[in-house]
Regions:
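Conserved beta-strand hairpin/beta-sheet module of binuclear metal-dependent hydrolase folds
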Residues: 1-49, 144-156
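Glycine-rich phosphate-binding loop signature in dinucleotide/nucleotide-binding domains
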Residues: 49-54, 123-128, 148, 186-187
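Metallo-beta-lactamase
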Residues: 36-37, 129-223
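Residue-level marker for buried hydrophobic side chains located in beta-strands
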Residues: 29-31, 60, 81, 152-154, ...
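A structural signal for the main folded, soluble domain(s) of proteins
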Residues: 1-5, 21-23, 40, 57, ...
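Short Pro/Gly-enriched beta-strand edge/turn motifs at strand-loop
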Residues: 1-8, 101-105, 126-128
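C-terminal regulatory/interaction regions
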Residues: 224-248
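Active-site HxH/HxHxD metal-binding segment of metal-dependent hydrolases
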Residues: 37-40, 44-122, 216-219
Length: 248
């Protein structure tokens, strides 16, 4: 589906994240790749636009979770892959816990991230500029990509329509997540291109709702620790629960 001129959404299937194609006058960029099983589907999506994976100039991963990075090894055979340095480190070390492999019952083939991104980097496609925002919270190496000309944010799992947040998993934490959404709240953003769910043109409202949910999550975690203290359960019980986080 073409969302804006030169921007297409490839809707994720079977729990895979959405992928987005950005086509400028000089470069064609794929944002996220879904699960390892998404290879054939994404190849078909490209074919529908008269393209093959070899026509891509760059793949950008918004973070290391396997539902976003799973098909990257196939695309890495013909074009460079970019990610935030923290995400790239987890991919290089095959950190299966933070990459959520077990949660998706999938394994990620070895591949290298070629380009390390930092906050403030710009990816120029020719007529389209993507500004890299480091947005930790959902995980430590998460990024969003801002296309300022049309006020479009490729928000991945950081913030989605109706204020849905992607959860605090693996390397994520609530405090960073709140700081990230506070930062996004002061930017000029109209449209969210999320990793899951529908596209939204109410970015300000979505971010505000997401912030409320995160503050609620912080309050809930404080209440949980208070309950553990009251019932005599300690840190070891909490750690046993955390070890199961990647096995649901």
């Amino acid at each position: 589906m073409e969302c804006f001129e030169g921007i297409w959404q490839f809707v994720g299937v079977s729990r895979a994240a959405h992928a987005y194609l950005v086509r400028g006058t000089r470069r064609t960029i794929l944002i996220d790749t879904g699960l390892p099983t998404s290879v054939a589907y994404l190849t078909d999506c490209l074919a529908g636009l008269g393209m093959t994976p070899a026509d891509l100039d760059l793949v950008v991963l918004t973070h290391e979770h396997i539902d976003h990075a799973g098909a990257a090894p196939m695309f890495a055979r013909s074009c460079p892959v970019a990610a935030h340095r923290l995400a790239a480190r987890k991919i290089a070390l095959r950190d299966e816990f933070t990459m959520m492999n077990k949660a998706f019952a999938a394994d990620l083939e070895n591949f290298e991230v070629d380009l390390l991104l930092e906050d403030g980097c710009r990816i120029e496609a020719g007529g389209v500029s993507l500004h890299v925002l480091h947005t930790p919270g959902h995980c430590s190496g998460a990024i969003c990509l801002l296309e300022p000309g049309r006020r479009v944010l490729f928000s991945a799992d950081t913030i989605m329509a109706s204020g849905i947040v992607g959860g605090v998993l693996g390397s994520g934490n609530v405090a960073d997540y709140i700081a990230t959404l506070e930062r996004l709240a002061i930017l000029r953003i109209d449209h969210l291109m999320p990793g899951h769910g529908r596209i939204s043109s109410n970015a300000d409202d979505d971010i505000a709702v997401g912030l409320k949910r995160l503050h609620g999550l912080l309050d809930d975690s404080q209440a949980l620790f208070a309950t553990l203290r009251e019932t005599g359960r300690g840190f070891d019980d909490m750690m046993r629960s955390l070890r199961e986080l990647n096995n649901f």
